[in-house]
Amino acid sequence: MFYTNVETLLNTNCFALLPEAYAPFDPLVDVLPIIPLLFLLLAFVWQAAVKFR
């Protein structure tokens, strides 16, 4: 019973929809989750620049 409720919640896109007032920011919200990955890549580039001291 619990799993069917979770499936229902995940199948609805209520988590992915912004309120209408914030609709212009939708492209920005799509990109925001990538930013932590960029910091991770930056750490590797930085260590490569200092030869992994």
Swiss-Prot record:
Residues 1-16 form a propeptide. It is found in: Plastid, Chloroplast thylakoid membrane. Its main location: plastid. It is a single-pass membrane protein. Keywords: Chloroplast, Membrane, Photosynthesis, Photosystem II, Plastid, Reaction center, Thylakoid, Transmembrane, Transmembrane helix. The chain crosses the membrane at residues 28-48. PANTHER family: PHOTOSYSTEM II REACTION CENTER PROTEIN K, PTHR35325. PSII is composed of 1 copy each of membrane proteins PsbA, PsbB, PsbC, PsbD, PsbE, PsbF, PsbH, PsbI, PsbJ, PsbK, PsbL, PsbM, PsbT, PsbY, PsbZ, Psb30/Ycf12, at least 3 peripheral proteins of the oxygen-evolving complex and a large number of cofactors. It forms dimeric complexes. Belongs to the PsbK family. This is Photosystem II reaction center protein K. It comes from Euglena anabaena.
